[in-house]
Amino acid sequence: MAIKNILALVVLLSVVGVSVAIPQLLDLDYYRSKCPKAEEIVRGVTVQYVSRQKTLAAKLLRMHFHDCFVRGCDGSVLLKSAKNDAERDAVPNLTLKGYEVVDAAKTALERKCPNLISCADVLALVARDAVAVIGGPWWPVPLGRRDGRISKLNDALLNLPSPFADIKTLKKNFANKGLNAKDLVVLSGGHTIGISSCALVNSRLYNFTGKGDSDPSMNPSYVRELKRKCPPTDFRTSLNMDPGSALTFDTHYFKVVAQKKGLFTSDSTLLDDIETKNYVQTQAILPPVFSSFNKDFSDSMVKLGFVQILTGKNGEIRKRCAFPN
């Protein structure tokens, strides 16, 4: 890596508050000499898909997050298994969507620059570009990740944060990945474009403590609204995680959480910690022009993209994202 690029990356990481032991692991210009149009190719494919189906932005962002939280940002969430025991087969990942976008971007790259760009990098770029397509923030994606060869269902179950988790558990989950409480609340803000289903909220509505009760931390009016949408036996109906602003990347999610209308326990529990609560309440009342959320989200996404990465001779560059070479 050229000295100027190392310095540029160090400056970038200093600006966004990221601490990385060896800054030259990744490079903003990693593919510039061998495949200068790599990012342009990925962006073109992503725009093509997301402009037709805006809900893909949330799905691709979620996929990148789930990839990074299990064995690091190594594309292991993309791997298939003949025995259905890969990460994508774990219950939390059964609802992941958008694989076709990653595959299309990888195929386009293989035509232009074969055996060069990792699926892990493709997924990181696709997630960034998908959010940008719907008007969300754009963030720099240092490149040079390598693809993992291992993908285990149990790893996903052990590492992915649960929508039923309390704040203490979530902070521990994030700390294990080198992410702090601010990253937790900021990345939770990605739920501003999130979509879920009655299946993940049913217990909060009808059997929170095993006695047929509702979660007392929820706004009673929101409980009534959700019960109308989700009868006790309905596990399929889709729910917007940010009602009224579901396809807009903005701070409305924090207003919802501040009103005790967070869909998941993991949303509501952000009010149970001083630091995360202060962030929620601040973003909830600030006019968008004064909000730091877009920058904060960009900073935390850069940090997320460095979690347990494979570089150098570790891992491989997959030819097809669903299968190891």
Swiss-Prot record:
Substrate binds at P161. The record marks R62 as: Transition state stabilizer. The keyword Secreted applies. InterPro entries: Haem_peroxidase, Haem_peroxidase_sf, Peroxidase_pln, Peroxidases_AS, Peroxidases_heam-ligand_BS, Secretory_peroxidase. The active site is at H66 (proton acceptor). There are 73 peroxidase genes in A.thaliana. This is Peroxidase 1. It comes from Arabidopsis thaliana. The lineage of its organism: Eukaryota, Viridiplantae, Streptophyta, Embryophyta, Tracheophyta.
